[in-house]
């Protein structure tokens, strides 16, 4: 449950348009006004995934801290890791405003931001000032007007190699025309070959191998999932993030806002994204790391992502409604789940409801 101060802050922020409120929240984190809410360390929640030591399985998804302004402040809220971006080589303004919409009855958000960000240079300078111990991933994308989108992803690898703990290639935003075409098998093979070749070159030069993840959409056909899984396995990719926002509008209460174009996130995405997660786990087998994202709003929904096949989970939109205390509450709740079920590690529940979720028709 949120506390009275969080509820008051939320009411104040909801008087502002969503994009202004987002900017205010970034400034609040920068200033230190938002107190640390981290849960006590719990070895049962620790995991080594893709060679990285995660203190707990909960991360902040890309999209909130686009320009790497507050990664360490987010970690102090209780997240085990955070992901900045999506960043593109050149700064870009994104799509016209308004471009973020709250669906309050649904505890959802629709956005059509379009990779608005300050560009590689600005984000790099900020990350260079961060502790090297902070577990910060860098989500990379392509400029809207790029003549060579694959080259933009390669530039992201090279630019941020010294400061990224992991990379995410975002090919699944619905708000950059043609971007999701990179999920098609031939295009995906070319992208992964180029990105991983750049990573391997940087690893050879530095002696440090940075894992690369791929973030996919939930709006995939079975054939599309087959193709992505085949390329992930063929390229020995370090992991998958499932999923980005959806274009679907099924079952929403707020039909007025539901008509807005863009990607839907928040509570209504939970079932769809979790089913796709489980289907990808079935295709990839037990060893490829998967980060589950979409509709995580509580310790129980975070745990259910793990039961469906995730190693780690991320959230963003639900914090709009639950406040900055949410990550700490989720991490404490996962510790309580370990107590209740007498778990030596949170990993013990992974895949325990894989068949159920893989069979869901959503």
Swiss-Prot record:
The record's section on Pfam families has: DHO_dh
Topology relative to the membrane = Peripheral membrane protein
Q: What class of enzyme is it?
A: oxidoreductase
Describe, as the record does, how this protein assembles with itself and its partners: Monomer.
Q: What InterPro entries is this protein classified in?
A: Aldolase_TIM (IPR013785), DHO_dehydrogenase (IPR050074), Dihydroorotate_DH_2 (IPR005719), Dihydroorotate_DH_cat (IPR005720), Dihydroorotate_DH_CS (IPR001295)
The UniProt record lists the EC number as 1.3.5.2
User: What is the free-text note on the cofactor?
Assistant: Binds 1 FMN per subunit.
Stated role? Catalyzes the conversion of dihydroorotate to orotate with quinone as electron acceptor.
CC cofactor: FMN
> Pathway listed for it?
Pyrimidine metabolism; UMP biosynthesis via de novo pathway; orotate from (S)-dihydroorotate (quinone route): step 1/1
Q: Which family does it belong to?
A: Belongs to the dihydroorotate dehydrogenase family. Type 2 subfamily.
Q: What is this protein called?
A: Dihydroorotate dehydrogenase (quinone)
Any keyword Magnesium? Answer: no
Q: What are the binding positions for FMN in this chain?
A: 62-66, 86, 139, 170, 215, 243, 266, 295, 316-317
Instruction: Print the keywords alphabetically.
Output: Cell membrane, Flavoprotein, FMN, Membrane, Oxidoreductase, Pyrimidine biosynthesis
